[in-house]
Amino acid sequence: MQAIAVWTLALAIGQTGSADDAYFEAKIRPVLVETCFKCHGGTKVSNQLRVDSREALLKGGKNGPALVPGQPDKSLLLKAIRHADEELKMPPGQKLPAHVVKDFADWIQQGATWSTSGKIHFNPRQHWAFQPVKNAPPAEDPSGWANHPIDRYIAARLCEHGLKPVEPADSRILIRRVTFDLIGLPPTPAEVEEFVIAWDAASAKPQAAWGKVVERLLASPRYGERWGRHWMDVVRYADTAGDNADYPIPEMYRYRDYLIDAFNADKPFDQMVQEQLAGDLLARQGQPDKFAERVVATGFLALSRRYATAPYEFMHLTLEDAIDTTGAAFMGLTLRCARCHDHKFDPITREDYYGLYGIFASTTFPYAGSEEFASMKLPRQHFVPLAPNAQKIMADYRQRLKELPPQIKKMEAEKGNKQAQEKLNALRAEERLLHRLGLPADVPGAYAVQDGTVVEARVHLQGDPDKLGPPAPRRVPKFIEGKPVVFPADGSGRLQLAQWLTRPDHPLTARVLVNRVWQQHFGQGLVATPNNFGLRGEPPSHAELLDHLAGEFVRHGWSIKWLHRYILQSKTYQLASNPTGGLLAKDPNNRWLGRFSRRRLDAEALRDAMLAVSGRLDLKRPGPHPFPPIQAWGWTQHNPFKEIYPSNHRSVYLMTQRIQRHPYLALFDGPDTNTSTEKRTTSLVPLQALYLMNDPFVREQAEAFAKRILALSPESERRIAWAHEIAWGRPADKVEIAKGVDYVNRYKHELKRTAESGERLELSAWTSYARVLLTANEFVFVD
């Protein structure tokens, strides 16, 4: 095994005093080590530039010398960290704090002397994310703006960068913002007015009114649908297996519903982690009434993508997907990079990787179907019955499958007997159905995993499963193991892995989760790379705040609803989105959170909002998708399963595939179901505008909305005012009402030329106006 790389950086020894040494050691070296060495030191050198010695900086890289002692303005190093050149910004994407830039400028001005201490040792294990969580109290805000701990952390960074927060948002903006955030739907006019009155009343306590709204939304069943969908992005949820023919998984909806119910019930996150990795094992240890949901939870692993055309073909790639998603979802680590060799950046070895590989190789994954399913008359396999005592049922099922062939053979011998032929056809149909189902027809099952034969994996040389290297006993990554984890001889070790991940002192699990929640509330995480907390990921913008949230999250029982309450109570969340006082110029990406970031509704929220405003949203939970009967399955790689099932249910219930993305979700930046989606892109492209103008779905919602408007009142002014309230969360002003009435009248005038008249003409005109409201920025964006 290669030893974990510890990069020893040979430093030039210059003539310098102890004061210069102290300055370099305190202010320059730590920044080079933490920020620069991962790309410009050790085994990794970008653009031929090294920063591990004074000589290397004097020599420079592709762009020339990086350091000109005594001349800061001629030093490319300083130009890069000042972000003064569009093509030369280091570190990329985020500027170092102003005081750090000044430290480098002063250091260069004073001659850029280098430490005489000889050597600097940089150990990747010292990376910030691998250190224990430190819940340090925030400093007091001298301005008096911050009284919540979150706000004090934010105020400190704003002050550091010479920035001030904007004013609080308007009450109507706030309730629309938090309602979309927590349940993914627009507030009703009644909900808006109730909150506005309570918030704006002179004698009222605004935060009490705010807290009441937050509690109402967290108690809504719609909350789990919204936040379950966020987690479905992370776990690469799909209703198909991903093989070449993309076979459907009719049982997969149970895992979707598990996630929705878990968020609604505020199931502690450490428990959710354990159930998703080892729910089948926990099910046999706990209460019978929890058996089914815990088994279903392992859909997280069962969802690992299948490949090729045969059952369990390229299973090593399926296991790789399980390892990679586990690492990304719970630890924010790119474990896949250690499949062929020790990780080039993070201290993860091949032995760590194949130690995890052995855990999942000791696990039995279900087979949903593939191209050979029909051609070779294969059964679905290893689906798990959702009954605690299913052994007798399964034994009877297997016995029945054994009995059927002799009975069929006997019937085949009785030619010419019509009654026997009918019975033969029935027996053949029964055998085909039972064989294909993989479970008795009347027994509910889950697409879940279960323990298999225990395997101690061997290293795959260059990642090739046909070239086996030394043994790699099951284990967790050694560099953050802490107290040794003991794996059982008679089990996969998934439960031990899950328990290790949820230790209160684990350095990654809580940090990664609170960062995901923060990202959904603010549009960007404190760590901008939620699936990569390693050395190649972005450092946190507010490291102390991240640790504070992680520590308090664990202290409050891993409660995600507690975390929502805590974040939403902050002034930072309640800021307006319009930048003032040069804030946009100084902090264009809102990294320091002096304002709220305006955001486009994501695909699901946009579709659901249209359905809600039109009055056609079906809030019932739909259950399984209407897949074809299993007897008809026979898809191939040249004719894969492809289907779209229209519905008026919430978008979380749309059937999603791996080979063919749902066209609407693809257009509006829905998640990639083949891999963990850490953060969705947000595009604004002409095709989206064309969809909103022409798609039948939008037209249907606009017409239904128009019918609601027409039913309200015969007066056009009242109709316009109400339509704005329900669509945009605010009443129309006098100018908007006048323009709206004029638009409808002119539209009706034009329609009369087409011989359209009466009720149809009225509906068409108001449908057009309704579409304007549903496609306007004020509907599509949240401030």
Label the model's feature ranges.
Residues 2-14:
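Bacterial N-terminal signal peptides
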Residues 32, 326, 330-336:
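Short metal-coordination and nucleic-acid-contact micro-motifs, chiefly zinc-binding Cys/His arrays
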Residues 36-39, 337-341:
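Short cysteine clusters
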Residues 142-177, 181-222, 236-275, 280-287, ...:
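Primarily short, surface-exposed interaction patches in extracytoplasmic proteins
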Residues 769:
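Globin-like tetrapyrrole-binding proteins
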